[in-house]
Swiss-Prot record:
Species in which this protein is naturally found: Pan troglodytes
Disulfide cross-links: none
InterPro entries: Cadherin-like_dom, Cadherin-like_sf, Cadherin_C, Cadherin_CBD, Cadherin_CS, Cadherin_N, Protocadherin/Cadherin-CA
Pfam family, one: Cadherin_2
Name of encoding gene: PCDHGB7
Lineage: Eukaryota, Metazoa, Chordata, Craniata, Vertebrata
Stated name of the protein: Protocadherin gamma-B7
SUPFAM superfamilies according to UniProt: Cadherin-like
Residue intervals annotated with topology Cytoplasmic: 713-929
Length: 929
């Protein structure tokens, strides 16, 4: 940072230094903030307004968590005003000991953003200590022969205060023999020396008592005293003399204990006992006496304890040499301790944010720390470094203060925490280092969406499953932590109707298990697709979708249903006519059945259960075709009955039965008298009356129902077909996945409008547009047959005369044996049949059979036996044609004729059928009817 920081002092006895120019938005200050306070300031006293000096408002004090930190915290910050307050007793002599300049270094830390400011509090000395002598009484022995002006060094007083409050001067009590002289020590201190002014005379006065007073420079001054007791002895007039007054020695702090550092030497010109010299410490501090030892006979000085430059840089000792005659002299020994690189750097964490958001950008401060090396010079210069492979770096904010900041993007899913090792190395030789490891936890952010184990799921569920059972399970994982990684599942879309989705499936929000809410029916619902969503609990939440396709497998739960032969409108069995001259291989009729199942479960086989003449007819195993085995014999009955069983290929197989009534006749006139003329019983009068009453009642009821039905249909239809009166079909399907109820509840629903012209002589009917929505809950095929028969039955009795004029069968109806349809498109008449190549072929075959059944009421096929019809009247059964699946038309045979559905398709397409007698066939059929 550029610029300079000036200082100002507070008014009053407390001197406080403030910065005149303080940068507000820099991470660190160019110079530390300085305050000056006297020692022994009362607790709670205000040092200065730290918030103001830092440029912070009162609101910022608590918002940015202004605080101070130090190794020993003597100060605190008022959270309301931002004042820096005295927290603990401040004793300058205890804190700074002998240092003349006493400063306390603090760090002011603020958050949001994290920053640090340096504070120096100068502790000013207060005159709270009086000078003090180590001994309250000083005993001296002075020979009477001592010459005038002889000086005797006295013990110095100690005053912990500094500057003006330190020791200022000495005073001696008034006397006529001695005066006091103050001399300066090399270290700047003062010591007193007692100077003889008058010759002593032991015989006159053998002892002298004086008072030595030490005064400091305080206001008011403080003092300390010591009693001096001087004993006058006989003359030993030559005191010992040191070779030099001051001895200086430089000593490395790493010298081991027991090392000799210096030998002092004193000589005495006296002889005898007065020349024997002993050495001793005189007025030496206890600390120095613990570190050094003195040989009292040789004057050799040894180390007793390890030296520590960081604790004491210099030792000053007074050595006294005394002869046996009690004469003494003193010298000074100054030991300079030379610093060695014996202290490793220290790392002190001042602030640490151990929780770091993983979306923190580079440059975010996560920790503040400082280094300290007690060595001096290059031994105390410290460099910091980080362990490798961590996305952090160190910024030096000021002298020995550092910031640990992010250097790269963080990813908790890859590394949830970092053990960052900070290494500090000094520049000594050899260098010393230390390290500190801090753990930084990365706080999770919802930055990962759930991921499904599969891109899509496919599950097969058999139909008629247990409701409530699980059918599938989806699983998604989220690498985030806690709520951000907690996944819940839900259904969000489906190809089913949304309002009925909950009645089909549900999903467990916790486990992802999909449950079936109902039993599925393959015939109604073969497949459906769900869209499931996995969502975590983060804010904002993240989600992922996956599709689940459910295939409903078929089970053999539907028995075959016989479409032909069907019962008549009055419940009587219909019959087929067979020419008497029918030859072996002649196609008599065909049993038509369907199975709503699929696959093997819908592969039908036909079996003869019972026959009037077992050897007269054969039944195709797969086709259901009834053919002549031999010609009709004279002994054979004209009326034949066959009981046919239709079985599917399921395990176990299901079956249905149908009864065929066959009449051998060359014309319809031979058959009708047997069915229309009944012998009258003897009591026919009463029976006739009963039947008449019942018939009249039924006719009245039917008439009323017909009128009501006609009115209702008129109201529901938006228009009336021009062809005549129409009846709405009940064969229709509902929208959605619900299957059709027609025939055997299969999957090929159709709905038609059934219209009959008003001309009873031309009972042709057509199918028009399909109806979209109408319920179908019963077997409508039989209803259609009954309706058709009820409409056409009156014409049978009315046209008996026309029947007698029936034209002979048209030879164009006949097909050769090779032209007759076989199974699966073959024309060789093989009854074994072939299995469809795939499921599509099977479904197409079922569609063909259902379509052929639906053609029972198709208006495009005339009742007169035109091309494409079965050649039967309304009384004898429904008409079967095929117009939806042309590939399978040849598999459906039209009983009573040699035509196939291909002819009917040609007629619908506007093409003339094979043969030129189409009109004659139609008129002939009308005459038969």
């Amino acid at each position: 940072m550029g610029g300079s920081c000036a200082q100002r002092r507070r008014a009053g006895p407390r001197q406080v230094l403030f910065p005149l120019l303080l940068p507000l938005f820099y991470p660190t200050l160019c110079e530390p903030i300085r305050y000056s306070i006297p020692e022994e300031l009362a607790k709670g006293s205000v040092v200065g307004n730290l918030a103001k000096d830092l440029g912070l408002s009162v609101l910022d004090v608590s918002a940015r968590e202004l605080r101070v930190s130090a190794e020993k915290l003597h100060f605190s910050v008022d959270a309301q005003s931002g004042d820096l307050l005295v927290k603990d007793r401040i004793d300058r002599e205890q804190i700074c000991k002998e240092r003349r300049r006493c400063e306390l270094q603090l760090e002011a830390v603020v958050e949001n953003p994290l920053n640090i400011f340096h504070i120096i509090v100068v502790i000013e000395d207060v005159n709270d200590h009086a000078p003090q002598f180590q001994k309250d009484e000083i005993n001296l022995e002075i020979s009477e022969s001592v010459s005038l002006g002889m000086g005797t060094i006295l013990e110095s007083a100690e005053d912990p205060d500094i500057s003006m409050n330190s020791l200022s001067k000495y005073q001696l009590s008034p006397n006529e023999y001695f005066s006091l002289v103050e001399k300066d020590n090399p270290d700047g201190g003062k010591y007193p020396e007692l100077v003889l002014q008058k010759t002593l005379d032991r015989e006159t006065q053998s002892a002298h008592h004086l008072v030595l007073t030490a005064l400091d420079g305080g206001d008011p001054p403080r003092s300390g005293t010591a009693q001096i007791r001087i004993l006058v002895i006989d003359a030993n007039d030559n005191p010992p003399v040191f070779s030099q007054d001051v001895y200086r020695v430089s000593l490395r702090e790493d010298v081991p204990p027991g090392t000799s550092i210096l030998r002092v030497k004193a000589t005495d010109q006296d002889e005898g006992i007065n020349s024997e010299i002993t050495y001793s410490f005189f007025g030496v501090a206890d600390k120095a006496q613990h570190v050094f030892s003195l040989d009292y006979t040789t004057g050799n000085i040894l180390t007793q304890q390890p030296l520590d430059f960081e604790e004491v840089e210099r030792y000053t000792m007074n050595i006294e040499a005394k002869d046996r005659g009690s004469l003494s002299t003193r010298c000074k020994v100054i030991v300079e301790v030379v610093d060695e690189n014996d202290n490793s750097p220290e790392i002190i964490i001042t602030s640490l944010s151990d929780q770091i958001m993983e979306d923190s950008p580079p440059g975010v401060v996560v920790a503040l720390f400082k280094t300290r090396d007690r060595d001096s010079g290059e031994n105390g210069e410290v460099r910091c470094s980080l362990s490798r492979g961590v996305p952090f770096k160190i910024h030096s904010s000021s002298n020995n203060y550092y910031k640990l900041v992010t250097d790269e993007a963080l990813d908790r899913e890859q590394t949830p925490e970092y053990n960052v090792t900070i290494a500090a190395t000094d520049r000594g030789k050899p260098p010393l280092s230390s390290s500190k490891t801090i753990t930084l936890h990365i706080t999770d952010v919802n930055d990962n969406a759930p991921v499904f184990g599969q891109s899509a799921y496919l599950v097969h569920v058999p139909e008629n499953n247990q409701p409530g059972a699980s059918i599938a399970q989806v699983s998604a994982s989220d690498p985030d932590f806690g709520p951000n990684g907690r996944v819940s599942y839900s259904l969000i879309a489906s190809d089913l109707e949304s309002r009925t989705l909950s009645s089909y499936v549900s999903v467990s929000a916790q486990s992802g298990v999909v449950f079936a809410q109902r039993a599925f029916d393959h015939e109604q619902l073969r497949t459906f697709e769900l869209t499931l969503q996995a969502r975590d609990q983060g804010s904002p939440a993240l989600s992922a979708n996956v599709s689940l396709r459910v295939l409903v497998g078929d089970r053999n739960d539907n028995a075959p249903r016989v479409l032909y032969p069907a019962l008549g409108p009055d419940g009587s069995a219909l019959f087929d006519t067979v020419p008497r001259a029918a030859q072996p291989g002649y196609l008599v009729t065909k049993v038509v059945a369907v199975d709503a199942d699929s696959g093997h479960n819908a592969w039908l086989s036909y079996h003869v259960v019972q026959a009037s003449e077992p050897g007269l007819f054969s039944l195709g195993l797969r086709t259901g075709e009834v053919r002549m085995v031999r010609a009709l014999g004279d002994k054979d009955l004209v009326r034949q009955r066959l009981l046919v069983a239709v079985r599917d290929g399921g395990q176990p197989p299901l079956s249905a039965t149908a009864t065929l009534h066959l009449v051998f006749a060359d014309s319809l006139q031979e058959v009708l008298p047997d069915f229309s003329d009944h012998p009258t019983p003897s009591d026919s009068q009463a029976e006739m009356q009963f039947y008449l009453v019942v018939a009249l009642a039924l006719i009245s009821v039917l008439f009323l129902l017909a009128v009501i039905l006609a009115i209702a249909l008129r109201l529901r239809q938006s228009f009336s077909p021009t062809a005549g009166d129409c009846f709405e079909s009940v064969l229709c399907s509902k929208s959605g996945p619900v299957g059709p109820p027609n025939y055997s509840e299969g999957t090929l629903p159709y709905a038609y409008n059934f219209c009959v012209p008003g001309d009873q002589m031309n009972p042709e009917f057509n199918f028009f547009a399909s109806v979209d929505h109408c319920p179908a809950t019963q077997d409508n095929l039989n209803k259609d047959s009954m309706l058709l028969a009820s409409i056409l039955t009156p014409s049978v009795e009315a046209d008996k005369k026309i029947l007698k004029q029936q034209a002979p069968p048209n030879t164009d109806w006949r097909f050769s044996q090779a032209q007759r349809p076989g199974t699966s498109g073959s024309q060789n008449g093989d009854d074994t049949g072939t299995w469809p190549n795939n499921q599509f072929d099977t479904e197409m075959l079922q569609a063909m059979i259902l379509a052929s059944a639906s053609e029972a009421a198709d208006g495009s096929s005339t009742l007169g036996g035109g091309a494409g019809t079965m050649g039967l009247s309304a009384r004898y059964g429904p008409q079967f044609t095929l117009q939806h699946v042309p590939d399978y038309r040849q598999n459906v045979y039209i009983p009573g004729s040699n035509a196939t559905l291909t002819n009917a398709a040609g007629k619908r397409d506007g093409k003339a059928p094979a043969g030129g007698n189409g009109n004659k066939k139609k008129s002939g059929k009308k005459e038969k009817k």
